[in-house]
Amino acid sequence: MKKKLIKSYAKINLSLNILGREKTNFHKIQSIVSYVKLHDKIYIEPIIKEHHIVKFKGPFSKNIKNDSISKLLKILDKKNLIKKKFKILIQKNIPQKSGLGGGSMNAGSVLSFFIKNKIVRISKNEIVNICNEIGSDVLLGMDRKNSIILNKRKIEKFNTKIGLYVVLIKPKIGCSTREIYKRSKNFSKNQIKISKNIFKIESLKSAKNDLEQPAFNLYPILRKLKTFLSDVEQVKFVRMTGSGSTIVAYFLNRKPAVNALKLARKNFKNYWSILSKTI
């Protein structure tokens, strides 16, 4: 096998509802998830070595510890599910601690590649178990179909296309997921009803992210960013993705999204920002 390129796309939470706590003290969540064209590039090739090699480069490659791909390889080796060793180079274009799931999507993308190329042969149950062992969002990285995460981590996939332009802006801070969940006291009563209509713009506009309030209390700049983007012309809705710290503004057309990006960069010069589109 020659060197291959895998594109690992960023995920966005169009909604995130906290329903309560499980007996294990983890939160019960439901979420509508989509993907944008922003992606990490993963180069992978077999090597004749004793150990795998995992390296990072790019604008967001510094200070990566306990990366998800190394965890995946360690699990596959331990279970004797992979015979060869691989060199994997990741071009990191997705910021860390951004709510965009960069690391989780990386592991899911690599596992999906191994399975499709018959490097790893495992059952659906084994896929779920391995993904959950690495992280709660890794299963979402296995493919990039729009998804609804239901209680007990059940995931429903849809072929529906959303077709929205997005402006993503992230301050220099990275949110502490643990602290934000710990401060989440208000739980949603209404559960998501599975329907293709749930991905329509009017339905998405009325959705919410229950983690916004505790995140905004911890990091007031996030509230400021959302307020700013909510006032730009032709924006349909603005929402934090995941536990932050990226705020996402959604548009039907490219031109107002471009204008919003210009305004955001003018007013928040030192923040990371980008224009993208849902897949």
Located regions from the model:
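Residue-level signal for inorganic ion chemistry
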Residues: L14, I42-I44, I69, G103, ...
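Hydrophobic C-terminal alpha-helix "anchor/cap" residues
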Residues: V33-V36, L76, C131, L229, ...
